């Protein structure tokens, strides 16, 4: 293990050496090399690689690899979920949205948060009692294993791929800007670290990377918010009045409605964000890392608290950037635009309130944020291939633990190569729609199957398959025919589907398809699946027979 670790660490130093060489001949558009940021980044990488080495010693079984043996506490898992969910897009994107649009930014952040009560009250407990490693365990509990797991794995992999592309491109652009590092080198560096964390440390290393990132991000955001409030005498009234006085839009930044052009787009976006959260495979997988349903509920309670606090801070940070960044010519280029674009508002604010040292800290935290999210995504993708497709579909449940883990680690390596390749391929593409599409597919395929399989006794395999595939394909087709891809990317004059987000219609297709093709299923298999609901209901409520945490 030590030899393999040293070889991979050697591989890791190649991009760093390239980075050092590149800094001398770098593109003038990039930021100058930030020594504080590099030192903190190297400290973070060193610390997390040590955690990965420690985790690799404790990861002996399939349960250890997928779920950290089920030994994570509710509080730890709450922090890890927050670390998994609070992406760089949340930190930089929402504060940038507040910086440009004011109150609308808060509404957008609520969209990410409002899905969590659904998970707390409807999903967390039953998911933990019925599942073992992936959400497909739950969806296929009383239905036919092979078709349902195939659909769930496809839904998971599509969501993971889209989310991963968005994160990798975002990572490359962000690191290029923050560290003065070449885009391709940045993407390769993120890919190598991601593979190392997941391949060697499994869920235990991924969990602790996410916990450390969440603590660092919450600390950094708190410090920034406190410094912003200190500058206005800790008065929200003064903060908003001064922001309105400085902002080009004036008082209109305090009113909603500027984000979406019509109510259908608003509803579709809201539904995608709300229900998509409850269908994200890397989030659902985290509920199997705790010992029982009680700890799963605690996880959501703590995670919602941490994330609610964080999104509240981004609102203050956004308004702080209006005050302290937009009025400061030091952060503007020759045309009067923000250096690095509006997404850099929070990073410039870190410089304004804490100087070079704190700017370095926030830059390193932004990098940590990306690594934590891509590690979670990679593990979710690998488990969908190894546990759902290989073990239960191809081998029909007869695969050995050793073979399943081997397939999982090979998949991690493949996902790493694919993520790096797609990150480089999509360098100059608009990747914002990919996150929207990932949420829409999660809301249109994964969520309907999970929620209906848990609560509706008349569901059959036929209904789940037809409805699930219909929801997934409708989401993808409507997104392609919509304004983002059909007009902006493919160059057509007008979109066939006029709205940006498909969730409103694709979710409807999924639910109607599942309902109709289940109630019209008169087969013997369908009758048996309905009869098995009672046993599933008892286990989902009591936890009798559910997998427990392993002790080491």
From Swiss-Prot:
Alphabetized Pfam families for the sequence: SSF
Keyword Ion transport: yes
GO molecular function: acetate transmembrane transporter activity; glycolate transmembrane transporter activity; symporter activity
Example of a GO cellular component annotation carried by this entry: plasma membrane
Domain of life of the source: Bacteria
Entry membrane topology: Multi-pass membrane protein
Transmembrane spans: 5-25, 35-55, 78-98, 105-125, 151-171, 185-205, 208-228, 264-284, 305-325, 357-377, 407-427, 431-451, 466-486, 499-519
Gene name per UniProt: actP
Protein's name according to its UniProt entry: Cation/acetate symporter ActP
Coiled coil: none
Localization (cell): Cell inner membrane
InterPro entries the record matches: Cation/Ac_symporter_ActP, Na/Glc_symporter_sf, Na/solute_symporter, Na/solute_symporter_CS, Sodium:Solute_Symporter
HAMAP family found in the cross-reference section: Acet_symport_ActP (MF_01426)
Keyword annotations of the record: Cell inner membrane, Cell membrane, Ion transport, Membrane, Sodium, Sodium transport, Symport, Transmembrane, Transmembrane helix, Transport
Assigned protein family: Belongs to the sodium:solute symporter (SSF) (TC 2.A.21) family.
GO BP of this protein: plasma membrane acetate transport; sodium ion transport
Role of this protein: Transports acetate.
Primary location recorded for the protein, binned into one broad class: membrane
Entry annotated with the keyword Iron: no
């Amino acid at each position: 293990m030590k030899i393999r670790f040293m070889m991979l660490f050697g591989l890791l130093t190649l991009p760093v050496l390239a980075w050092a060489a590149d800094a001398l001949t770098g593109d003038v558009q990039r930021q100058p090399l930030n020594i504080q940021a590099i030192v903190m980044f190297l400290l973070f990488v060193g610390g997390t690689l040590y955690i990965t080495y420690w985790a690799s010693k404790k990861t002996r079984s399939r349960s250890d690899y997928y779920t950290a043996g089920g030994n994570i506490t509710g509080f730890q898992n709450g922090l890890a979920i927050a670390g998994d969910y609070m992406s760089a897009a949340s930190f930089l994107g929402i504060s940038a949205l507040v910086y440009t649009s004011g109150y609308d930014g808060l509404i957008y952040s609520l969209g990410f948060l409002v899905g969590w009560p659904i998970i707390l009250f409807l999903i967390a407990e039953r998911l933990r009692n019925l599942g073992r490693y992936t959400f497909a365990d739950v969806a296929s509990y009383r239905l036919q294993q092979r078709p349902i797991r195939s659909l769930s794995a496809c839904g998971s992999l599509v969501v993971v791929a889209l989310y991963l592309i968005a994160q990798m491109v975002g990572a490359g652009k962000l690191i290029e800007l923050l560290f003065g590092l070449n885009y391709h080198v940045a993407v390769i560096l993120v890919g190598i670290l991601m593979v190392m964390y997941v391949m060697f440390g499994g869920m235990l290393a991924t969990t602790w990377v996410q916990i450390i990132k969440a603590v660092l991000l919450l600390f950094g955001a708190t410090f920034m918010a406190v410094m912003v409030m200190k500058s206005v005498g800790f008065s929200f009234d003064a903060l908003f009045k001064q922001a309105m006085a400085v902002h080009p839009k004036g008082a209109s930044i305090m009113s909603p409605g500027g984000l979406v052009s019509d109510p259908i787009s608003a509803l579709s976006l809201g539904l995608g964000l709300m229900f998509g959260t409850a269908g994200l495979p890397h989030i659902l997988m985290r509920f199997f890392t705790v010992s029982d349903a009680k700890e799963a509920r605690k996880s959501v309670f703590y995670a919602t608290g941490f994330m609610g606090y964080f999104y509240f801070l981004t609102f203050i940070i956004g308004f702080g950037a209006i005050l302290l960044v937009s009025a400061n010519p030091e952060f503007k280029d020759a045309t009067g635009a923000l250096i690095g674009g509006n997404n850099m508002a929070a990073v410039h604010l870190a410089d304004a309130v804490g100087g070079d040292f704190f700017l370095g800290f926030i830059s390193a935290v932004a990098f940590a944020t990306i690594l934590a999210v891509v590690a979670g995504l990679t593990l979710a993708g690998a488990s969908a291939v190894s546990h759902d497709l290989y073990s239960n579909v191809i081998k029909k449940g007869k695969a050995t633990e050793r073979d399943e883990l081997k397939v999982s680690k090979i998949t991690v390596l493949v996902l790493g190569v694919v993520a790096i390749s797609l990150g480089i391929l999509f360098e100059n593409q608009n990747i914002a729609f990919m996150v929207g599409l990932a949420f829409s597919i999660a809301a249109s395929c994964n969520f309907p199957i999970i929620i209906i399989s848990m609560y509706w006794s008349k569901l059959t395999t036929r209904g789940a398959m037809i409805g699930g595939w219909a929801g997934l394909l409708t989401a993808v087709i409507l997104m392609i025919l919509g304004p983002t891809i059909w007009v902006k990317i493919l160059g057509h004059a007008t979109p066939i589907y006029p709205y940006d987000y498909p969730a409103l219609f694709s979710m409807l297709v999924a639910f109607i398809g599942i309902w109709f093709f289940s109630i019209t299923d008169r087969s013997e298999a369908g009758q048996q699946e309905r009869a098995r609901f009672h046993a599933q209901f008892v286990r989902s409520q009591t936890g009798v027979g559910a997998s427990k945490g392993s002790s080491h």
